UniProtKB/Swiss-Prot annotation:
EC number: 3.4.25.1
Enzymatic reactions: Cleavage of peptide bonds with very broad specificity
Keyword Cytoplasm: yes
Protein name (record): Proteasome subunit beta
Localization terms from the record: Cytoplasm
HAMAP family per UniProt: Proteasome_B_A (MF_02113_A)
A GO MF label: threonine-type endopeptidase activity
Signal peptide from the UniProt entry: none
Biological role stated in the UniProt entry: Component of the proteasome core, a large protease complex with broad specificity involved in protein degradation.
Activity-regulation annotation: The formation of the proteasomal ATPase PAN-20S proteasome complex, via the docking of the C-termini of PAN into the intersubunit pockets in the alpha-rings, triggers opening of the gate for substrate entry. Interconversion between the open-gate and close-gate conformations leads to a dynamic regulation of the 20S proteasome proteolysis activity.
Gene symbol of the encoding locus: psmB
An example Gene Ontology CC term for this record: proteasome core complex, beta-subunit complex
Amino acid sequence: MLGEIQDKVYKGTTTVGLVCKDGVVLATEKRATMGNFIASRRAKKIYRIADRVAMTTAGAVGDAQFLARLISVEIKLYEIRKEEKPTVKAIATLLSNILNSVRWFPYFVQLLVGGVDKRGPSIYSIDLLGGAIEEIDIVATGSGSPTAYGVLEDRYTPEITVDDGVELAVRAIYSAMRRDSASGDGIDVVKITKDGYFELSKEEVDKILSSLRRA
């Protein structure tokens, strides 16, 4: 039953996250598929859910969009009630609880929640049943993740900066796009530091891709 439902929904594909010494980097490609059909070439898979926190999604687009709206509202309510910003861990825990509460008919998503708070930079991966794990270095999700992991494992170091992390994230997604038919159609990248939330422009991403193609 679950397999039949999964075959009928739009599915996201490849996302990556890096914990850097001065922040976090999150990146995704833009293709959404329905079976062998390319349903969209402009699927949004990175959502800004708090001041310095973002969420990436792999899986069913409808479920991902609903969860992004829900968690954004919950964060605003938290800030009003507590008069402080929630930590990345608190946001990941809330998402974990939401997903676990509907485990008998789950949202078909795999999430990354990353950002910078008073504890520093951190990223959590969350599965469709609500299992949440803090990733201390690199993480990739979706159908292109095996290829992305190969690139990340080879080039990541604990001392990497967000600027170098951006280039590595683009390289990992680009490699996945070349080998995974469900990944493609451009790359979105976000870097988050104590100074703020920065989304790379298409021109900035294209410049990195051009240098990779020449290498």
